[in-house]
Amino acid sequence: MASRSLGGLSGSRGGGKKSLSARNAAVERRNLITVCRFSVKTLIDRSCFETIDDSSPEFNNFAAVLEQILSHRLKGQVTWFGYESPRSFWDYIRVACRKVSQNCICSIENMENVSSSRAKGRAWIRVALMEKHLSEYISTALRDFKTTRRFYEEGAIVLGEEANMLAGMLLGLNAIDFSFCLKGEGLDGTFPAVIDYTPYLKFEQSSDSISSDEEELRTFGSSDSEGSTPENVGPPLILDENSWFNKCKRVRQKYQLTLEQKGYLEELLRLRENQLSESVSQNKILLQRIEDSDLAHKLEKEQLEYIIVELQDQLKSYQSLDQLSAEVSLSQASLDPGHSQEGDGKQDSLNFIGEGKEDTPSLLGLCGSLTSVASYKSLTSLKSNDCLASPTTEITSPGLTPS
């Protein structure tokens, strides 16, 4: 019975340790994400009044927060002997961000003054901010879930729901123009980054607590006033003066913060107004171009319609002329049929004569083929000049007579 009770006690202790560990991990993740949100806001506010560089405390704090977020529950590198050596988040970024177009991974790997992995990771943060691609790098790395699981343990920020919040928070930094020197002391990878929580810590006293404090002061002042003399009236007045001074200081701080926010909002409003005016002017230009193109299209359409109508009229006139010429030729043929037959007979006789002359073998050597008009003309000229003699004709000399 005692052994069972001891076993139950040990089991409850194990469950309590697990729940405590889960709570601590959740609190750690929530703290880092909250501080990251505050650091991004302060960085955006500060960028409205001055250029952000390595000397800016807001940037140094943001870089420390981001470095700790990316190093949260990062697995060690297993050596040949089975031991785990600590590694930097740069080893994860170098593998997971290879798919980013025009990435700066190779250029950071080839930097001469940066040797350690931690220094390369810090250089990557600065280069990504100057390129305005830090959110894109983080989003691409988080989408590669297989690589992320290989580098981080369970309970890491990059494996939880806070990862999507991180990518969304970093998107606002694309509006800031950063200026960093990649040879400064900020790239020293000897010591880990430390977060300064003091700018984000603010104690707010509840209204009940304030009223109870005022009641205590009143009771304390009334008890002292009963047996007080003119000599011991000083301390309550001093306390009252200090309280008014603190209130005035708090009001001044609130006024200064409100003034800075007002300046930031005015600058943002001016930027949006400029963008709106540019968009309106571009819209007017585009509308004018659309109207001009519509007018040109209408004119072109009217011209094409006029050309089509004119071509149709010409086609109709040509068709009527062809029909009229056909009717005229038919009427001429019906009025003079003998002339056409006589012409046909003459043509047939000429063809017959040409064929007969062509069959004579004695003329082929002299005049060639009589199928052409030129050969026929040469033959007729020879006949007229008596150049062709008959084979029965005798050649006699005029001076010789038969005896």
Curated annotation (Swiss-Prot):
Residues 1-20, 207-232 are annotated as: Disordered. It holds the Pfam family RUN. The keyword Glycoprotein does not apply. Keywords: Coiled coil, Methylation, Phosphoprotein. The keyword Phosphoprotein applies. Residues 220-231 have a biased composition (Polar residues). Residues 296-321 form a coiled coil. Residues 53-185 form the RUN domain. The modification Phosphoserine is found at S211, S212. The modification Omega-N-methylarginine is found at R13. InterPro entries: Run_dom, Run_dom_sf, RUN_RUNDC3B, RUNDC3A_B. It comes from the Eukaryota. Interacts with RAP2A. Belongs to the RUNDC3 family. This is RUN domain-containing protein 3B. The lineage of its organism: Eukaryota, Metazoa, Chordata, Craniata, Vertebrata.
